[in-house]
């Protein structure tokens, strides 16, 4: 008994070696799995991205009333918006009034008539 404790059985050493080999194998497997996840073709996130792209159509009715995102700092509000918002060059904070102006309302919330009444407003105003 004492010999097996101090020197260690050759069987026990084999067991330890097998454990080390198994850990190396599992490390290789995890590396391969991580490579597969990081590769763009086999990534499991593409399905979720497709689902996001499909489900994001719910936001489109709200988005189209907002000004275009490109060149947002130089954006001019369309003249259809009432009051001082008419030709403003900086992007003001989006208030419900602005959204009401942007969404082709007939009359402005402040009882000012729009500059071109009963004309179809372009959804994307010209960026200057």
Swiss-Prot record:
Q: Region (Disordered) spans which residues?
A: 24-43
Composition bias, Polar residues: 26-43
Q: Which domain of life is it from?
A: Eukaryota
Its recorded name reads Putative uncharacterized protein encoded by LINC00303
- The organism encoding this protein is Homo sapiens
Gene from which the chain derives: LINC00303
